[in-house]
């Protein structure tokens, strides 16, 4: 329903933040991994979102990186895990670290994440191992000029068929402070042809 929001960061106090989009304040819940990289209040921000509706509530979750949102959704597909534990996972470890823990089957490290016991960790390893390679943190989406161009170029490169991690690396390597999105994309594609 709501896949992405771009607006002014009006409020941030973990785990809640508010983004003003055209005069409407969207309240979102976000993991600490998102809070670490948020710009200051009053600055532009772009967040990937996940909309969840239950019988008695509607929730909106925000993530700076597409890989975080993807992981949030995949973790909730594991039997017995909901949004609260999925947020705890993203607040406790990076997407890349989580993928490593799942791939290696490190049950002990997974149980250090709040809300995850041994049986849940074992279920996570079994149910997510095949998808762990697809997890990628990607580049953060922010409203600042340089990073914004790099982030938007990352999304564009993904739409051209590049994997999220590869697209993020290409855009980051090609981008310079103040570059336009088209410039970053052009430089990234030229570098890929060399």
UniProtKB/Swiss-Prot annotation:
Places the protein is found: Cytoplasm
CDD domains associated with the record: UBA_RuvA_C
Keyword DNA repair: yes
One BP term from GO: DNA recombination
MF-aspect GO terms: ATP binding; four-way junction DNA binding; four-way junction helicase activity
Database matches in InterPro entries: DNA_helicase_Holl-junc_RuvA_I, Hlx-hairpin-Hlx_DNA-bd_motif, NA-bd_OB-fold, RuvA, RuvA_2-like, RuvA_C, RuvA_C_sf
Region (Flexible linker), start-end ranges: 140-144
Region (Domain III): 145-194
A Pfam family the protein falls into: RuvA_C
Major site of localization recorded for this protein: cytoplasm
Region Domain I, residue ranges: 1-64
Keyword line: Cytoplasm, DNA damage, DNA recombination, DNA repair, DNA-binding
Chain intervals for the UniProt region annotation (Domain II): 65-140
One GO term describing the cellular component: Holliday junction helicase complex
Transmembrane segments: none
Domain remark text: Has three domains with a flexible linker between the domains II and III and assumes an 'L' shape. Domain III is highly mobile and contacts RuvB.
Family named by the database record: Belongs to the RuvA family.
Quaternary data: Homotetramer. Forms an RuvA(8)-RuvB(12)-Holliday junction (HJ) complex. HJ DNA is sandwiched between 2 RuvA tetramers; dsDNA enters through RuvA and exits via RuvB. An RuvB hexamer assembles on each DNA strand where it exits the tetramer. Each RuvB hexamer is contacted by two RuvA subunits (via domain III) on 2 adjacent RuvB subunits; this complex drives branch migration. In the full resolvosome a probable DNA-RuvA(4)-RuvB(12)-RuvC(2) complex forms which resolves the HJ.
Function: The RuvA-RuvB-RuvC complex processes Holliday junction (HJ) DNA during genetic recombination and DNA repair, while the RuvA-RuvB complex plays an important role in the rescue of blocked DNA replication forks via replication fork reversal (RFR). RuvA specifically binds to HJ cruciform DNA, conferring on it an open structure. The RuvB hexamer acts as an ATP-dependent pump, pulling dsDNA into and through the RuvAB complex. HJ branch migration allows RuvC to scan DNA until it finds its consensus sequence, where it cleaves and resolves the cruciform DNA.
Entry protein name: Holliday junction branch migration complex subunit RuvA
Record organism: Xanthomonas axonopodis pv. citri (strain 306)
């Amino acid at each position: 329903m709501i896949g992405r929001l771009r607006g002014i960061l009006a409020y941030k106090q973990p785990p809640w933040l508010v983004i003003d989009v055209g005069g409407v304040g969207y309240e979102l819940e976000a993991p600490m991994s998102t809070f670490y990289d948020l710009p200051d209040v009053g600055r532009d921000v772009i967040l990937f979102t996940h909309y969840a509706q239950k019988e008695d509530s509607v929730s909106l979750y925000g993530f700076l990186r597409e890989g975080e949102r993807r992981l949030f959704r995949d973790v909730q597909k594991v039997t017995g895990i909901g949004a609260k534990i999925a947020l705890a996972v993203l607040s406790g470890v990076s997407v890349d670290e989580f993928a490593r823990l799942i791939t290696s089957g490190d049950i002990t490290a997974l149980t250090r994440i709040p809300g995850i016991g041994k049986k849940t960790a074992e279920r996570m390893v079994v149910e997510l191992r095949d998808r762990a390679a697809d997890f990628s943190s990607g580049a953060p989406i922010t409203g600042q000029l340089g990073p914004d161009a790099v982030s938007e170029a990352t999304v564009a490169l993904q739409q051209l068929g590049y994997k999220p991690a590869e697209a993020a690396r290409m855009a980051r390597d090609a981008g310079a402070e103040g570059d336009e999105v088209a410039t970053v994309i052009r430089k990234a594609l030229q570098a890929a042809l060399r």
